[in-house]
């Protein structure tokens, strides 16, 4: 039995009276009252800081909007005034300008739509692209994960740089400081780490603070050319922008990276650099009349950087297992690691990679100081095969550097020490790596195993660079030959026997590289031209010349075998007497020539050139005088070089006479 609808309700629905009544009841329940909005006034403005009064309830870091559309955030809160850091040019902000609260804190857009884009710290595009869809926003100031929310750092973050991956391993979720003097390759090392993530699942965020626009453009172009820009976000606050944007830039970069970390992905943040960020914080603090401390920095500078870098972490499996790694960059002055900001950052981070200006000047790139650099995670996040292969690398290299310092005072006679010096030179050549020449983990393990086995000891250090360039293709070919058809993928790093076999094959590659180098040295041309220019007419002439020289040497060896030792000694005595007489005659001729009485030589007619007209005759006369001033070949010297043998009349090649002739010519020139 179906229920019948209520007649009044049906009538109301038909006429719409019920809907109207309900709407009237809802409107009656709304409390209509005026809403008070506090409006403050600008008391004064200077250097990107506005001092505002009348907004006592403002929160710290709250966004304030000025009349005319300029925005800023509350930096310090005093009883009477609020120091507001402007995020836009202060044009239009004057005294008595109205200021209103927004009730919101600074936020930045986050999400996949930022990948491949260049934005400012507020998410505004700088690459000329379309505006970003702010479907997801995150506050720039977020709390760091608690201890219970973190997990151990146990996965490596491969940088492709051998010295970093082997000696100072960086783990996913680690904070590793890159520190060094100006122009020592700090940014280059960080960009190499970003470029190497093109084959990984890591999202990279590059934050530029106070950098020149041209330098930032070079970084972006390098990532677009060698890396995977579709997996990178560039947050740029150049030196020409407002100090407020430079101050919030690293916080915005971390918030963008945290979006991916919180979803179980892995992210890497490069902050370039925190020294300029500290200078910006000091500038804002001094402008807002905060009391200065050591090196004029405010007392909270340590807390500012600590709360920023503590946001890098490896989350637990319950939270998705994502990670956020940080590579902050800091600049030192004349290598002073004991300065205020460097010591703060070293104590906050999980290790540091120190770049030395002397090593950089010696053309060692990257110029990593092995003695001062450290990773406090290290082997816990290193691949087991790489950890086993690089066990003694740091110790051997440190001992080599110490021995090398002693060799400057004298030679080494101990064979063991000489072998250690040789091994150290190969290690230094191996860890010297050009930019954008990243190595795979397999390449690094095989190289270190070959080094430990002594395969590199016999090769020249100059051949290490060709070995590093040709090794990946060589290993790929070897793996393809060792892998059966339709075989499942194989983890070569987990097979010690396979790694040993690949390391042994490096010896064959070294022999090929050495043979190619010898061939190029013999041909006297670069590698790219040697293959194409040896053949043909030039190659035939060179081959014929080599054959003639070989025939001459063979004939001389045959003559030497035909002459008896007694005949050779007799010829040597005859040649010595002849050379002695020749030397006496040359000395007498030199003395006569100096005195103007050279025998057998007519004095040149010096009046003849004056009678000659200008042109070829004068040039010919000058050429004659020049040829006369050059030493002429001596017939007797030539005869002395080939002396008859008393047994058989064979000719003997005598080198001693040639040496005496050379000494006589040298005396003549003096």
Swiss-Prot record:
User: Where does this protein reside within or beyond the cell?
Assistant: Cell inner membrane
Catalytic function, reaction form:
ATP + H2O + 4 H(+)(in) = ADP + phosphate + 5 H(+)(out)
This protein's UniProt keywords: ATP synthesis, ATP-binding, Cell inner membrane, Cell membrane, CF(1), Hydrogen ion transport, Ion transport, Membrane, Nucleotide-binding, Translocase, Transport
List cellular component terms (GO). plasma membrane; proton-transporting ATP synthase complex
Which parts of the sequence bind ATP? 180-187
Pfam families recorded: ATP-synt_ab, ATP-synt_ab_C, ATP-synt_ab_N
Q: Which CDD domains match?
A: ATP-synt_F1_alpha_N, F1-ATPase_alpha_CD
Which residue ranges does the record annotate as region Disordered? 527-670
What is the protein's quaternary organization? F-type ATPases have 2 components, CF(1) - the catalytic core - and CF(0) - the membrane proton channel. CF(1) has five subunits: alpha(3), beta(3), gamma(1), delta(1), epsilon(1). CF(0) has three main subunits: a(1), b(2) and c(9-12). The alpha and beta chains form an alternating ring which encloses part of the gamma chain. CF(1) is attached to CF(0) by a central stalk formed by the gamma and epsilon chains, while a peripheral stalk is formed by the delta and b chains.
Function, in words:
Produces ATP from ADP in the presence of a proton gradient across the membrane. The alpha chain is a regulatory subunit.
What this protein is called in its record is: ATP synthase subunit alpha 2
Q: Which organism is it from?
A: Burkholderia pseudomallei (strain 668)
